[in-house]
Amino acid sequence: MSNQALYEKLEQTRTILSVKLAELINMTTIADRNDDDEGSFAQENSELAVATTSVMMVNNQTMQLIKNVQDLLILTRSIKEKWLLNQIPVTEHSKVTRFDEKQIEELLDNCIETFVAEKTT
């Protein structure tokens, strides 16, 4: 990913987190009840249903917040890794061979001769 794409994704995730957190705060505010009624059974069931739905919505928003925070952590890690890797100087590999090819060829020939000699006897 390019730097620009990482920063755009970071900004997008930050915006989503802000919106989801605001929605979560709005859902958790408790409205004033109208206590003028005597509290009939139907009203209690209705309040229970609303409360249950609200709890489910809060849980859903919380899970989305957690996922977005995880995305944010992954993005910041990618940005840090990219920054660190760009700081490391690139070393050129030497073209000098580590092994003597002639010596390796002789060892291979000796092994083949030994193997063939064992098969024939």
Swiss-Prot record:
The modification N-acetylserine is found at residue 2. GO terms for biological process: positive regulation of transcription by RNA polymerase II; positive regulation of transcription elongation by RNA polymerase II; positive regulation of transcription initiation by RNA polymerase II; RNA polymerase II preinitiation complex assembly. It comes from the Eukaryota. GO terms for cellular component: core mediator complex; mediator complex; nucleus. Gene3D superfamilies: Mediator of RNA polymerase II transcription subunit 22. Keywords: Acetylation, Activator, Nucleus, Transcription, Transcription regulation. The keyword Transcription applies. GO terms for molecular function: transcription coregulator activity. Transmembrane segments: none annotated. Its main location: nucleus. It is found in: Nucleus. The keyword Nucleus applies. Present with 2181 molecules/cell in log phase SD medium. Component of the Mediator complex, which is composed of at least 21 subunits that form three structurally distinct submodules. The Mediator head module contains MED6, MED8, MED11, SRB4/MED17, SRB5/MED18, ROX3/MED19, SRB2/MED20 and SRB6/MED22, the middle module contains MED1, MED4, NUT1/MED5, MED7, CSE2/MED9, NUT2/MED10, SRB7/MED21 and SOH1/MED31, and the tail module contains MED2, PGD1/MED3, RGR1/MED14, GAL11/MED15 and SIN4/MED16. The head and the middle modules interact directly with RNA polymerase II, whereas the elongated tail module interacts with gene-specific regulatory proteins. Component of the Mediator complex, a coactivator involved in the regulated transcription of nearly all RNA polymerase II-dependent genes. Mediator functions as a bridge to convey information from gene-specific regulatory proteins to the basal RNA polymerase II transcription machinery. The Mediator complex, having a compact conformation in its free form, is recruited to promoters by direct interactions with regulatory proteins and serves for the assembly of a functional preinitiation complex with RNA polymerase II and the general transcription factors. Belongs to the Mediator complex subunit 22 family. This is Mediator of RNA polymerase II transcription subunit 22. It comes from Saccharomyces cerevisiae (strain ATCC 204508 / S288c). The gene is SRB6.
